[in-house]
Amino acid sequence: MREYNKGIFVVLNQGGPFATGDAPPSIAPFSGAGKEWVRGLKQAGLTTKYRILRNQIFEFLGVGSFADINELLNNSDRRGVVEKRAYGLLGNMFGIDGNSREIIARVNEYSRTADGVISYLKGKVLANYASYIEMTNEIDSIKSPVELLLILFDDRYHKKARFEAKRKLVLMNLAASIDQRERETDVENKFLKFLDFLNDHVWSRKTRIGELEIVYLLSKHAPENFACTEVKVIDKKNFKEVTRKPLQKLTLVKRRRFQVNGGEVPIYVSIRKKPPEAKVLKLLRKGEENPAVAVDDELGLMAVMDSVMGVKLFQRHLTRCAGRAGSLLILEEVTDTLDGGDHVSSSIGSSSQTPMFKFFARMGGMRVEFIVHTNVSYINYMYQRDVSHDEYEVKRIFDSGVAEMLFPLDIYGLEMDKIKDRLIHWFRKRIEDS
């Protein structure tokens, strides 16, 4: 599990001095509760962090003390002035070009991304617990960072709402950093350039862009671990004649083709472009504030071939295509476990039992991650016990500590260790019984 006692994440730790309490932070520093809180702050070694955060809050709100914040809560005219100034500060900090309306629109996008992180978890990994983690309506609807920040000090709001306001601010900050990094590195244009390279040089010219061949992978699975023992490719014409038996799965894939030595080789391809909320989640899982961690591996492709020989053909084909496009292609960080051996991954929740051919291709000013499977390894990636992607999604959210950080026990009443085991069991049942 990651340690979230550093950087911006420390403010979400409900076991630390920045925890959201039953009442807002006290503006009376010399009260008994205030003195006890200061002692806890010193014991945690977070005094300097507190001073930095306090100064940032004061500067953002244009106040000189916590008493001024209390006055701001009761003065709507002054809040309007503060909010207008705050958008200007955010625009300059994150390098957002444009007038005030354009800056507000961009910040609103960060708000939608922050809400999207929670919606993604509520709709997928934690779908069985959606009613438990549903966001307070007022927090869901507020987009203004000033309004969200003031809620932290407003006694009218319940503890859960104040925590969610703070959480939303943290997620918005990460979304803004990622957006700034993407603009600096021109990721969007690089992605379009990557697609052009594939369409112009890699895929067969005998098919039109977007033209895909539907086939089905009929796989047999071992009862002890649901590993794939055999797989057959079934074309669309013969699909209706297939009757599945116990321990069999039928998986639809849409394949393209590339040309090698005058022949056409089929390949299933999934091109990765992470949505903003997925990038924020990656920073959370890694316990990182540096947006490069989420952005710099933005470009990626997963491919599935009929055999190991097909995988090697595709790798050589890529190298030749890059040359025809006027660029060398250099393979970096190559991992090949399709012929045996374990894949060593630093990612929390990932399995070393997942065979793959993985590398980063540096070409044409881009660095693209490629993960290439055979039909068998892809089926295992989808369905094998302790390996499947659904299990991996659950494990990395829970084992990294993200679930507990975003939905702490004292606010949501969810015991994450027990929930993790239940969810993995539920996903396994859905995979093996469907």
Residue spans of the language-model regions?
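Charge-rich, low-complexity segments
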Residues: M1-A294, I397-S434
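Long beta-strand-rich cores associated with HINT superfamily self-processing modules
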Residues: G287-S434
